[in-house]
Amino acid sequence: MSGQFEASVEIDRPVEAVFAYLADGHNDPDFSPRVQEISKSPEGRTALGTVFRSTVKDAGMKTGREFRIVGFDPPHFIRWTEQSRNLVTAEGGYDLEALPGGRTRVRIFNTLEGHGLGKLLVGFAVGAARKDAPAFGRRIKAAAEASLKR
């Protein structure tokens, strides 16, 4: 069983800058409070094949996550797939679109899939993610605009 959530937001910064901000996974804790720590391999610029390893806290439980970048087209999109075998895993991405006035539309989406016992939990996870999606988009906007000064 699986389900998807998504959010769209307009950021008052140029698409190239927003793409670079989102591609640097070290920024994830700025807008995703569930991310406790994150590392990248190899170091350097994010590219196809880059792996991000993170510790996240969901429903009071800490788990390790490992995501591989499987699609990367600056400044248009980023795609990832989770390689870790947790009860609920994610794959998704960002779509970015340049807007007039040096602004950017960002769409984030994730498909969550349950494995084993996670098949019983994925509905709750998707419901919570959908409920939080608009706020998640606003957190991305606020973090990117605060980090990327005009």
Language-model features, listed with the residues they occupy:
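Hydrophobic ligand-binding cavity/cleft-lining segments
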Residues: 1-42, 150
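Intrinsic-disorder/low-complexity, polar/charged segments enriched in Ser/Thr/Lys/Arg/Asp/Glu/Gln
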Residues: 2-10, 51, 64, 77, ...
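Short loop/turn positions at the edges of beta-strands in beta-sheet-rich folds
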Residues: 11, 84-86, 100
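A short, structured loop/turn motif at beta-sheet edges
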Residues: 15-16, 43-46, 70-75, 95-105
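Hydrophobic pocket/interface hotspot
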Residues: 17-22, 28, 52, 69, ...
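Glycine-rich portal/gate segments that line the openings of hydrophobic small-molecule binding cavities
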Residues: 39-85, 91, 135-150
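Short, solvent-exposed aromatic-acidic interface loops
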Residues: 83-88, 109-115
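A conserved amphipathic terminal alpha-helix motif
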Residues: 105, 111-150
